[in-house]
UniProtKB/Swiss-Prot annotation:
Keywords: Ribonucleoprotein, Ribosomal protein, RNA-binding, rRNA-binding, tRNA-binding. It comes from Tropheryma whipplei (strain Twist) (Whipple's bacillus). The gene is rplE. Part of the 50S ribosomal subunit; part of the 5S rRNA/L5/L18/L25 subcomplex. Contacts the 5S rRNA and the P site tRNA. Forms a bridge to the 30S subunit in the 70S ribosome. One of its GO terms (molecular function) is structural constituent of ribosome. This is Large ribosomal subunit protein uL5. This is one of the proteins that bind and probably mediate the attachment of the 5S RNA into the large ribosomal subunit, where it forms part of the central protuberance. In the 70S ribosome it contacts protein S13 of the 30S subunit (bridge B1b), connecting the 2 subunits; this bridge is implicated in subunit movement. Contacts the P site tRNA; the 5S rRNA and some of its associated proteins might help stabilize positioning of ribosome-bound tRNAs. Pfam families: Ribosomal_L5 (PF00281), Ribosomal_L5_C (PF00673). Belongs to the universal ribosomal protein uL5 family. One of its GO terms (cellular component) is ribosome. GO terms for biological process: translation. InterPro entries: Ribosomal_uL5, Ribosomal_uL5_bac-type, Ribosomal_uL5_C, Ribosomal_uL5_dom_sf, Ribosomal_uL5_N.
Amino acid sequence: MTCYTPRLLTRYREEIVPVLMSRFDINNVHQVPSITKIVVNSGVGDAARDSKIIEGAVSDITLITGQKPRINRAKQSIAKFKLREGQAVGVTATLRGRRMWEFLDRLLTLALPRIRDFRGISDKQFDGHGNYTFGLSEQGIFHEIDQDKIDRVRGMDITVVTTSSSDDMARALLGELGFPFKK
């Protein structure tokens, strides 16, 4: 039986690593920045009023990422938001390994081009440590979600965690991978 390697991972190893090594004058292949994990987070503030809303968020993130997300719960009660301690407030899925590369490939080639009036994502959302976070306003751009079965529009935050120490190296890595940054 042959071992399957995601196509974006193959492209990273064969094409992108040599380009980054020459661009940043890196001698050791292990110093080249790579992606560690991708965190997909969806906050569900209305779950305080209706507990069934969190089930829809769990099913959507499960379909999109291919793994069951963790339910985030409130750490403390906040009366103004009618929030009680222990209530579900969101879902988070952390992708690593093959699932991460497959999700990234689907995101870049299928999902982002389906956004209406899409002009690219901002390249100013790096955190100073080489990690990149951006938000999507609806889950319907993913092919896994059936448009007729959407009960409500849910946005999500996607964080790409890299081994890069600087934003410039991370920006170069993500640009080479195919992230459509605004010019």
